[in-house]
């Protein structure tokens, strides 16, 4: 805050990880003899988190932009600590273990984030419509997962099998060949423009690339 208010600077604040602040507050609360909540957190969790997050704001003197890592205990997003934290950021990005297990990096769930900037008047109508089409296809793929796991793809209708095939291609197309990950993936890093990315998704959604195998879309 001194950098913003006294030095009149714009500040970029990284917090790794915000749950440590919650745990510290829980320990202090226990030392003070306060009755914990049902899950064991301090009764003042919401107030403490609000006080911290409200300090990360812009003023006439400068701004503070924060990027925060949030550990989700036992992958339970309803846990009071992450649930209270998620009420404050402008946007969230979720990194599920399932995608990482498939070898898809970055393991970002396209159905879970809340991007405030993904609006047609900000990114453009074409970008917005393509993103919505991708999310709808992935959502339709997510619904019959139990049927696929138990009975296999043969029990799905022709339309559903086509949706599953395109969704799997989209999943792999969402992987990115990072320069920093060359030693792990064996694939050279490369830059891909947003225009090329949008065009690629449109071709998958329209069925132009139905003849290609899933692996052809991995790290391209």
UniProtKB/Swiss-Prot annotation:
Q: Which domain of life is it from?
A: Eukaryota
**Catalytic activity annotation:** ATP + H2O + 4 H(+)(in) = ADP + phosphate + 5 H(+)(out)
InterPro entries xref list: ATP-synt_VA_C, ATPase_alpha/beta_chains, ATPase_F1/V1/A1_a/bsu_nucl-bd, ATPase_F1/V1_b/a_C, P-loop_NTPase
Give the UniProt entry's GO cellular component terms. Answer: chloroplast thylakoid membrane; mitochondrion; proton-transporting ATP synthase complex
* Record membrane topology: Peripheral membrane protein
The EC number(s) given in the record are: 7.1.2.2
Its annotated compartments are: Plastid, Chloroplast thylakoid membrane
Question: Might you name a Gene Ontology BP term for this protein?
Answer: proton motive force-driven mitochondrial ATP synthesis
- Do you know which Gene3D superfamilies this protein is assigned to? Bovine Mitochondrial F1-atpase, Atp Synthase Beta Chain, Chain D, domain 3, P-loop containing nucleotide triphosphate hydrolases
GO molecular function list:
ATP binding; proton-transporting ATP synthase activity, rotational mechanism
Which keywords are on file for this protein?
Answer: ATP synthesis, ATP-binding, CF(1), Chloroplast, Hydrogen ion transport, Ion transport, Membrane, Nucleotide-binding, Plastid, Thylakoid, Translocase, Transport
S-adenosyl-L-methionine keyword on record: no
* Main EC class the enzyme belongs to: translocase
What the protein does comes down to: Produces ATP from ADP in the presence of a proton gradient across the membrane. The catalytic sites are hosted primarily by the beta subunits.
> What interactions and quaternary structure are annotated?
F-type ATPases have 2 components, CF(1) - the catalytic core - and CF(0) - the membrane proton channel. CF(1) has five subunits: alpha(3), beta(3), gamma(1), delta(1), epsilon(1). CF(0) has four main subunits: a(1), b(1), b'(1) and c(9-12).
- Of which family is this protein a member? Belongs to the ATPase alpha/beta chains family.
* Protein name as catalogued: ATP synthase subunit beta, chloroplastic
Q: Which organism is it from?
A: Osmundastrum cinnamomeum
Upper taxonomic lineage: Eukaryota, Viridiplantae, Streptophyta, Embryophyta, Tracheophyta
């Amino acid at each position: 805050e001194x950098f913003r208010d006294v030095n009149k600077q714009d500040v970029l604040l990284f917090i790794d990880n915000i749950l440590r602040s919650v745990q510290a507050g829980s320990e202090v609360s226990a030392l003070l003899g306060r009755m914990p909540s049902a899950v064991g957190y301090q009764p003042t969790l919401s107030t403490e988190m609000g006080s911290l997050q409200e300090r990360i704001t812009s003023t006439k003197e400068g701004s503070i932009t924060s990027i925060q890592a949030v550990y989700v205990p036992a992958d339970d997003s309803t846990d009071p600590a992450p649930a209270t934290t998620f009420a404050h950021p402008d946007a969230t990005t979720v990194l599920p273990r399932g995608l990482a297990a498939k070898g898809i990096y970055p393991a970002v769930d396209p159905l879970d984030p809340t991007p405030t900037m993904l609006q047609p008047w900000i990114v453009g109508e074409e970008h917005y419509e393509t993103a919505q089409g991708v999310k709808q296809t992935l959502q339709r793929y997510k619904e019959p997962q139990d049927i696929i796991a138990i009975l296999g793809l043969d029990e799905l209708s022709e339309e559903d099998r086509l949706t599953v095939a395109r969704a799997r291609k989209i999943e792999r197309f969402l992987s990115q060949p990072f320069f920093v990950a060359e030693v792990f993936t064996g694939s050279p890093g490369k830059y891909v423009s947003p225009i090329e990315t949008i065009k690629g998704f449109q071709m998958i959604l329209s069925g132009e690339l139905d003849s290609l195998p899933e692996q052809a879309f991995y790290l391209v």
